[in-house]
UniProtKB/Swiss-Prot annotation:
Alphabetical list of NCBIfam families matching this protein: PRK00405.1, rpoB
Known catalytic reactions: RNA(n) + a ribonucleoside 5'-triphosphate = RNA(n+1) + diphosphate
Gene3D superfamilies tied to this protein: 2.40.50.100, 2.40.50.150, 3.90.1100.10, DNA-directed RNA polymerase, beta subunit, external 1 domain, DNA-directed RNA polymerase, subunit 2, domain 6, RNA polymerase alpha subunit dimerisation domain, RNA polymerase Rpb2, domain 2
Cited function: DNA-dependent RNA polymerase catalyzes the transcription of DNA into RNA using the four ribonucleoside triphosphates as substrates.
Organism, as annotated: Borrelia recurrentis (strain A1)
Keywords: DNA-directed RNA polymerase, Nucleotidyltransferase, Transcription, Transferase
Pfam family, one: RNA_pol_Rpb2_7
Enzyme class: transferase
A GO CC term attached to the entry: DNA-directed RNA polymerase complex
Protein's recorded name: DNA-directed RNA polymerase subunit beta
EC number(s) given by UniProt: 2.7.7.6
Amino acid sequence: MIKRVHLGQGKAEEILNLPNLIEIQLNSYEKFLQLERLKNNKPLLNEGLESVFRDVFPMKSSNGEVALEYEKYYIEYDSISFTEKECKRKGQSYEAVLKIRLNLQFLTTGEIRQKDVYMGTIPLMTDRGTFIVNGAERVIVSQIHRSPGVVFYKEKDLYYARIIPYRGSWLEFEIDSKKDYLYVKIDRKKRILVTLFLRALGLDTREKIIETFYKIRKIEVNDDTKREITGQYLATNITIKENMTYRAGDKITLQDIEDFLQNGVKEINLIDFDGYDSVPGKHFISSDVILNCFEKEDAYFALKDGFKELSRESVMLAVYSVLLPGEPISIDNAENDLRTIFFSEKRYDLGHVGRYKLSKKFGLDDLTTSVLTMTDIVNTISHLLRIYDGHDVLDDIDHLGNRRVRSVGELLTNIYKGAMSRVEKIAKDRMSNKEVFNLKPQELISVKPVVSAVKEFFATSQLSQFMDQVNPLAELTHKRRLNALGPGGLSRDRAGFEVRDVHYTHYGRMCPIETPEGPNIGLIVSLATYSKVNDYGFLETPYRKVIDGKVTDDIEYLSAIDEEKKCIAQANASVSSDGNYTDDLVSVRISGDYTTMMPKNIDYMDVSPRQLISVSSALIPFLEHNDANRALMGSNMQRQAVPLLFPQPPIVGTGMERIVAKDSGVVIKAKRPGRVVLATNKKIVIKPDNATSERDLDEYELYKYERTNQDTSFNHSVLVKNGQIVNKDEIIADGPATRYGELALGNNLLVGFIPWNGFNYEDAILISERIVKEDLYTSIHIKEFSIEVRETKLGPEKVTADIPNVSGKILSKLDENGIVRIGTYVKPGDILIGKVTPKSEGDITPEFKLLTSIFGEKAKDVKNNSLKVPHGTEGTVIDVQRITKDDVGNLPPGVDEILKVYIAKKRKLKEGDKMAGRHGNKGVVAKILPVEDMPYLADGTPLDICLNPLGVPSRMNIGQLMESQLGLAGKYLGEYYDVPVFESATNECIQEKLKKAGFNETSKAVLYDGYTGEPFENEVMVGVIYMLKLHHLVDDKMHARSTGPYSLVSQQPLGGKAQFGGQRLGEMEVWALEAYGAAHTLQELLTVKSDDMSGRVKIYENIVKGIPTNVSGIPESFNVLMQELRGLGFDLSIYDDNGNQIPLTEKEEELINKT
């Protein structure tokens, strides 16, 4: 184990330890399946899978005679046929059978029939937070989406309020500020006037609507109050004579007041616009928008003053013509329909999140109602109008209080909900159709919808992704990723700048640095180090509580909503040992504003300086000295580092390396404390201290050179010896890219920042041959090749070494069964598995039968269908797997056997490989110099790597220089350092270490040229830098083609390495050749070397025969163009110089020959 020296400005020990870094996956799945509760026989909570079954059952038949009730579900662990390792080997899924106990109750007789019904299989999560589906490890990425609830926002001149449910119709209100009208939209259909909508929902008179939204005041009518009343609006109807009614919402004129006085009206109710805030708990409004809507109604229905209220029929017709245009309606049905859209639990569900958001917004205590209520609608309209009047503020859509996270458990719950609603439909049909009394519970339940939905989700959903397994950090980051894309999320094309941008609420919740470059920037992000997801799906981050200016050790997790308007101090504010701030003014932030405050006004304090960034970014030392763009590249490139054969932990680390290795799941940790009984390269056996018997031992199986998803090698190496005492959770075996239990993605190299003969121009890298010789950057890559042995119409295919027309030399690498021997070195074109397929046999002559019986298969008509090593691949065969029906029970239809061959290749560092540091400083190896030619220090030590100093100033990633300086001191002092982000070692501290190591405090030294032995003119910055080899290897990119496949229609060569394609000669290349007047070169490039079919064959013949050649026919693309024109109805033919027609198709050729 490495002892690290803490070189930070803060304390070495953290206030709060980091949570388990993959708990977002583990906790979410546990909440969904509740496996712990199932194992311990505890009652299940109403969440996840349990809530799905409770929602669907009980089911009752339409006649009410039969009910199907749910009791419980359980997982059959005995049904797990394979271990995780076997699943990967055999291409199977790691899953268990799910069963539910149902009671079929006959309500007329009281009889109950009980049965455990099979509900398909359910994939189980491994303890690393992954799933194994069809032999490949997959991760379900958490989705960040718009939270259900209500949002208020503005676009152009329109003010909007939108109520978004978890499931159901969207309700949207909008105010057109030019016209002062308020409209409502249901499911983004046409607009309806809000007063009509309110009438349809039960506020059917003007009086009721006014009473709901406005404060009303009474006023006496007399000559003194005339002036005050004139121009005001009535709040209640006033009837003077039988045919003369003044309606609520009408404007009062002097003439009206005269009428009131004449007819003995002493007191009237007026709308009090100014008293909107005078009643606590009531959201009254001061706007006349609703009154304008009354006027609009009058105009729409041509109502005259003194006319009565709108009839129920005309309201429902107006509303319904928008909801279901062109449908005949009955008024009662229409009214019921409208109410069920929002008020029925079957069709509408706010979700507990939506209800929480609504209640929080409007200050209500209700947290249980899952449907909308009239109060919600009224509150929403009032709030929107108050915003319009400037009494309230708009919401920020990108605030993390309005976005929430859906992890595995919730995504699966939704899949099961959808599937179970289909199951319910089928079951109800069967209940009403069949002979009821002969029914059994299992006959009612159709399991197909469930099985197919789960299968589809894991295999094809945008959120179920092939795990990024290049190295442990890539795995870990993939599990902690938040994706805004996917079903129910955003789409790349429609996502604007605002959604992608960093928001102040991301602090401590989402990393502002780590996100992909390119079209997904800002849509795919990473969880911050301390961040957790709460029960509502909102991201929370921990803070220390500050009471009366004193910092306590109480930790409180706050969501973005709770954090609003709180005053929060930074983690590195100076605090005395008793918890008091040492400064009179402390730097704080309040809702995105940065300012200073007196200690007594502070509410909370950050837990750690690294709480605002992600795990990848927290691995970059001196992060605060880098430009953010380069830090982003650094974070992303660490995930692409290939696991090396001999990695070293970084001399300059950040303290996160150990935590990442431990939580990524690639190392092996001791489950219980004890003593090592056996430690071999295959397994470790530990006898626990609290063993219950002699046989109670902990066995750990080690992975040896297993292939990962990205073809890198997964290999464990033992860290313990026989007889060693180990503690609980101690690391007993290293995994890929870990060393001594720490993440080790690369190696420490002696670097000089110096240009060298132009070989490190433009980010190119010059390295020493020592690095290649000592295998510092050698990695192992394992490829899998598979072949299926099928049953064909003409008989089965065979795996055999008896292959027709193949020389004995080629077959020498196969064993007697036709399978390549393990340990063989194979090259492109070699046969890995000999396979023959029967050809169709015509009538066999007696002579042929005789030959067959003498010579066996060779003479028989079979086709060679062997598996060969593809181009560009070579290496050693390390394993061969044969999977038959007996092994796995089910192979795809028509397949008898699957054979897999694994080929491993040791790849040394070579020119063209991409390397990078941790600060976004990437480059391609341009030259590998002999050690004696490398520049060397005064004591004769040659450099390992030369980087161009011009790569630093414009990129502004100074972190690499500070890392190099401290690394140099560490190398010569034999120390390893922890330099936590945002509280790194100071310049003085680094200079002190350099002096101690005997270097100049600037770490500049005189370098000598390896060619001439002369010193360079100026001193050169020398240091030790941590460099990684990235997954972009030149061997995977190099590609050449002589002859290969052609596209079917255009007959031009395919493109790309995967298709063994050619190099496209595009229009610009054609222009270049035209500019040179290279007519013959151009002609052959555009015809015989591309798509002139007859010319291709002829030229090949001529080359073989050695005849000088000058062939050219008609390129196929010309024929394609001709046929397209003919398809448009042009009758076209082509003729040569002599006037003879040239045929374009075989049919044409026949016709011409006839004539």
